Amino acid sequence: MIKIVVIGTGNLGTQLCSSFDRSDSCKLIGYFNRSNRVIDHLKAPLLENFNIVPACDIVLLCIPDDAIATVSTTLSTTAIVAHTSGSVALSAVSNHERHGVFYLPQSFSASRTAQFDDITLCLEASNSAVMEQLEILGSSLSRKRKHLNSVQRKHLHLAAVYANNFVNHCYLKTQQLLAKEQLDLAILEPLLRETLEKALNMGP
């Protein structure tokens, strides 16, 4: 059974902690966040100091992109260290002999339970042995996994930004226009669904 430590409990980190904590194929050993916030529903303990990592197989860095390299250099561990960013290169954690990337191209919210089954996990690793461990961990979450290098992953992440952020902006503008005349967004829900279905099935 793979033992995991998660550093960072924002939306993604919390969702991963919850999933790993419930899993029969991996075990969450502990988690760390800067605010020392205990996540009540987790069986695993809050770690007081991320510099002192308990014995585990994989440390996942679910932290802001600009903090990855700095945090990686402060970690003292022989475990695999993997970050979860779409735009940061594998080399950001290369100070560890065994390192990788565990990227999920999805938007996560604290108020919605993540459904990982259908998300394609994008993996990158320093060697085949590390990739095997990331594959095992990934299989506990999703049936879809893909190996991408840092350049491919960066382009995928940019495409995800267009697909998510720009579409949400258009939805916001739509809602604002309707609100000016006290019109309900529900009127356009069939149109929104049809537009998305056509884009997915027939192309934009």
Kindly give the residue locations of the regions a language model identified.
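Rossmann-like NAD(P)(H) cofactor-binding subdomain of soluble oxidoreductases
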Residues: 16, 35-114
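NAD(P)+-binding Rossmann beta1-loop-alpha1 motif at the extreme N-terminus of oxidoreductases
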Residues: 1-48
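Internal alpha-helical scaffold of NAD(P)-dependent oxidoreductase catalytic cores
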Residues: 113-159, 163-200
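Hydrophobic anchor at the start of a short beta-strand
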Residues: 4, 27-29, 81, 99, ...
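Nucleotide donor/acceptor-binding cores
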Residues: 2, 79, 119
